[in-house]
Amino acid sequence: MNEKTRKNISAAGLLIAIGIVYGDIGTSPLYVMKSIVAGNGGIANVNRDFIVGSISLVLWTVTLLTTLQTVFIALKATNHGEGGIFALYTLVRKRAKWLVLPALIGGAAILADGTLTPAVTVTTAIEGLKGIEFGHGNVPVSTQGTVIAITVVILLLLFSIQRMGTSIIGKAFGPIMFIWFTFLGVIGLMNMMGDLSILQALNPYYAIKLLFSPYNKAGIFILGSIFLATTGAEALYSDVGHVGKGNIIGSWPYVFVCLSLNYFGQGVWILNNPNYNAGNGDFNPFFEIIPQNIRLAAIVLATIAAVIASQALITGSFTLVAEASGLKFLPRMNIMYPSTKKGQIYIPSVNKMICAATIAIVLFFQTSAHMEAAYGLSITISMLMTTILLYEWLAMKGVHTIWNWLFLIFFGFLDVMFMLASLSKFMHGGYVSLVIAGFIGIIMYVWYYGNKIRDKRESRNAYVRLDEYVDMLTNLSHDEDYPTFATNLVYMAKVKYNKFIKREILYSILDKRPKRARAYWFVTVNVTNEPFTAEYAVNTYGTKNVINVQLFLGFKQQTSVNVYLRQIVHDLIADGTIESQPQEYTTTPGRDVGDFSFVIVNDVISPQTQLRSYEKFLVEARVWLQNLSSNPASWFGLDYADTVIERVPLILGNQRRQHITRIPPKKFEDIKKKLQAEGELKE
């Protein structure tokens, strides 16, 4: 750990990291050993070699994939403090165009996992309540239906508090998760003391031996259950922008030790209870290692930890979606910043979609055992894609070719093995995660390549120099042959390099129907890295009625363009930059600012567009997604302003020329007589 990273570590930061980042991997003990034993036919079909080998596989999987690959390597690959597969892609995308594919596939897989993690963890924890007596023989949670109802209520509450932001949530969750990991370690240690020979699992020999052992009925496919122990490693990388690299590195050793002790404790309990019979068929060694007199309190704590586990994926999903939108993988969405840190975000639409998908999964699968079959597959895919991108990042950083290839071969082999093992769950529920990932991936593919085709095929004169049209706009402003469209005609249009603007904007003013206005405003909104910036700059091109406004707004500042622009007009009138706009008819005496009309231009594919059918489909699908997902008036704070949405033709590629020939009058008369004779034309 370098000096800079060490300085960024604080007690509060460590607590927030434990509360936000480790929830997913921290609840793995709830279901990993349960899944492993069930996959081998139950507790009656396991022996010492199987348990020691299984725990060895778990520990070394977490060591290699979480500690080595994620904490020691991936956390170094951050983009301005942000982590995750999209941030990694941003660092390496100039090395090869095809690298966009692993980024799209991996990102879609992680977002799909965000719907499964809350469902699995919360359901597993609540299932621990089944059969627990409250008072004198009262068993309120006796059926799976009750478990599902409680799970759905908890999930609804979880998603409803997301608007509070990760800072507030982390402060509340951090101490609880610290207690949770301490509890895992203490309970595990208490059981482990009954048979310290379980520490043989630290030797990787037993892990490799189990893969080829006749006692292992699942064979190599046992890795599908083993991999569940490291789900959540991707959250460490995705959430680095929320809590900081130093706090993740500083807190991981404690978390890893506590997890290891709990797995050891569960292993010893299984070895000491070979004839255990759950009676009702519900067997979970995690709850069995807990003394009966504190089991109810432990289940409550496990439920809270499960809720926090879901938080890691939800916050990670917000970060990934924001990055995807910036990379033009996804449409623009309304992003909110609950705190003064730009890395901590909340996206209402994403929150609603994940909530709906998670609850649907709970209602569809009904039990945690069924959900576990769907869990993990999408994450193995994302980890393989991350490995490919990390290989490119290491090469970019100048790592020796031999070491770089060793990294790719070693971790690529591990990822492929876990992915193949997880594919064995496909027909038992794994298809659900792939369907969700596929749906997200298709949207990303359409949006990204639709934009690429549009940019490539768009006419070279798509952008024009605004300053070359200043005289024309000034003349139109004073031309009384045209009715006044508005006193202030405002276009929400980006002006690049202070002079280039899309031709469609000027087409809207001059060609569709000349729009006469006293002043033409072209407004560009620039979001800064500071939370509360509110500044502007103007360029009038030497006129008093053509104004290019560059707004610089902090990421927490409301984008109320309507309000800001009125203040800007007052400022410019006061210093003589533009002329006063006195109003004869007004409810405000002395008002010197006229009315505003805001115009937002939307593209429509022109029939004249010449593209290959596949390209045209992608561009049309991209435009459809834009119209479905966007609300520009809301983005710019124009909900209650006079806003006009205009559609202009988007002509891509070579234009299709359609010719019509004029015929002489005599020929027309001959055609007319012929049609009348045939009865096709009546007098």
From Swiss-Prot:
Catalytic activity: K(+)(in) + H(+)(in) = K(+)(out) + H(+)(out)
Alphabetized GO MF terms: potassium ion transmembrane transporter activity; symporter activity
Entry annotated with the keyword Transport: yes
Keyword annotations: Cell membrane, Ion transport, Membrane, Potassium, Potassium transport, Symport, Transmembrane, Transmembrane helix, Transport
Membrane topology classification: Multi-pass membrane protein
Domain of life of the organism encoding this protein: Bacteria
GO cellular component: plasma membrane
Major place of residence: membrane
Cellular location(s): Cell membrane
Coiled coil: none
Transmembrane segments: 13-33, 55-75, 98-118, 139-159, 168-188, 218-238, 251-271, 296-316, 345-365, 376-396, 401-421, 426-446
Entry similarity comment: Belongs to the HAK/KUP transporter (TC 2.A.72) family.
Function recorded in the entry: Transport of potassium into the cell. Likely operates as a K(+):H(+) symporter.
Identification of the protein by name: Probable potassium transport system protein Kup 1
Source organism of the structure: Lactobacillus johnsonii (strain CNCM I-12250 / La1 / NCC 533)
